[in-house]
């Protein structure tokens, strides 16, 4: 897609949310959905700055988290009640982020701002890559999120579940060398008593992830196969 096709306002098909687009979009190549009529749904893409991202990894949460931080789901108009737009999601994340970032870190920062502003209607895992770094971001409920820098000697094998199992909140809310998150994530965890660790080591997978039979039958099997 080129600059000539850039729009100043992005209106999403599924959620009807309006997101203003900044100036200075770069050219990028993406893999859109082959079926028209449901939005772009780009699975992945690379832009002119050689930054890549993928944003179609559906993950899961649990009732405790979603009760405290509901997904931002589109509500159609009913009678005299106007419609309520939903958040952003898989159909638009690549389009809203990739043309405007020059590094993987910038990708995390831009998507993080969008999530905190508009929320999301689904749980997703998103990867960002440039010449020097790879970052993995996972959404938590509506506007909350967290991201980790993938070490150079590691790789990510992620099934359809929330998978980050270690997180340094001090770094994420401070220098952000290897971790980033939504600005109020620490308060969110404390307010709703989501930290289930007994040893003082916060495990996001225990706090935010799913723990049901489908994980054992489906997701854990995918991990073993991919590794």
Predicted ranges, named:
Residues 15-102, 140-221:
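N-terminal accessory/precursor segments of enzymes
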């Amino acid at each position: 897609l080129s600059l000539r096709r850039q729009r100043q306002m992005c209106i999403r098909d599924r959620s009807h949310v309006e997101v203003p687009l900044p100036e200075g979009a770069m050219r990028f190549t993406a893999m859109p959905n082959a079926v028209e009529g449901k939005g772009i749904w780009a699975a992945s893409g690379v832009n002119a700055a050689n930054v890549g991202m993928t944003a179609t990894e559906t993950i899961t949460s649990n009732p405790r988290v979603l009760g405290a931080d509901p997904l931002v789901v589109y509500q159609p108009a009913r009678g005299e009640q106007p419609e309520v737009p939903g958040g952003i999601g898989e159909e638009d994340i690549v389009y809203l982020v990739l043309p405007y970032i020059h590094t993987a870190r910038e990708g995390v920062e831009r998507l993080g701002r969008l999530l905190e502003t508009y929320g999301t209607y689904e749980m997703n895992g998103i990867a960002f890559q440039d010449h020097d770094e790879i970052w993995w971001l996972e959404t938590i409920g509506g506007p909350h999120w967290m991201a980790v820098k993938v070490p150079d000697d590691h790789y990510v094998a992620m099934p359809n579940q929330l998978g980050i199992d270690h997180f340094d909140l001090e770094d994420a809310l401070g220098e952000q060398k290897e971790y980033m998150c939504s600005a109020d994530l620490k308060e969110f965890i404390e307010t709703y008593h989501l930290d289930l660790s007994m040893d003082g080591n916060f495990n996001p997978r225990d706090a935010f992830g799913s723990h049901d039979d489908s994980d054992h039958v489906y997701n854990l099997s995918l991990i073993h196969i991919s590794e």
